[in-house]
Amino acid sequence: VSFLGPRLPGAQTATSPADGAMVLYELSFPAPEHRWMQVEVTAGGLPAEPLSMRMSTASPGRYARHEFAKNVFEVRAFDGNGNELDPVRSTMARWDVAGHDGTVRFTYKVFGDRVDGTYLGIDVTHAHLNIPASLMWGVGLERRPATVRFEPPAGRDWQVATQLYPSDDPLTFTAPNLQYLLDSPAELSAFMERSFPVADPANPDHAPTFRVALHHDGTDAELDRFARRVPQA
C-alpha cells in the first residue's frame, strides 16, 4: 500500500544533466525475477575534484542505522564521453570517482526483497522502493533538482505511484532537491488507486487530496472498503 499526500510547492521541469542544473536517475528492472534494480545516475557541471557518491544510512521515520549499501553491487562509473573510470570504495557507503571530465555517469545494481517501508522489494509483480535504500547521491549536489525516469520490465503494464512531481511522460518524475527525493517512496505495479480530500481542522476551506495506491489481488469493492477506512487512521 502506498499513501500519497499532497505535493509541496516547487515542481521542477525535466532538463538535461549536462548543464549541471539537475541530476538524472534512470531506474530499470531487466530481471525482476532476480530481485534487483539497475540504477544509472548522471550529473554534469562538476568541479575538477573527485565526486563522492553516497548511499544513505538512515531513512525517514526510522531511528536506527541501516547499511543500505550492503545491497549494492556491480558499481561502475563513466565520464561524459563514455570512458570508464575507477570508482574507489572508500567506506562502506561511499564511492569516490576521480578523473572525470565534469560529467559522471554512475551505475550499479541494488538487490531488494523486503517490502517493509525501510528497504526495497522487487519481484515479477511489482517494485516497492524506499528511496534511501535504493538511490545513491552525489556529495555537494544535495540542492540540485533531480529527474527520475522509470523503465518497467518488458511486457509489464506497471504504473508509478509516488509523491514525486509528474511530467508529460507518465514514467518520468522530478524532485526539487535531494531531501524531497529521499522522502518520496515509489510503487511500480498494475495497482489500483483511490483518492479522497481531508479538510484542514484549522482551515476547513483547505482540503488537500490524498491518494491510496494498492497493489493487491482483491476486487474493486474491497479496495473501496479499504479506502473508506483510511481517512479514519
Positions of predicted regions on the chain:
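Early extracytoplasmic/domain-onset interaction patches
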Residues: 14-58
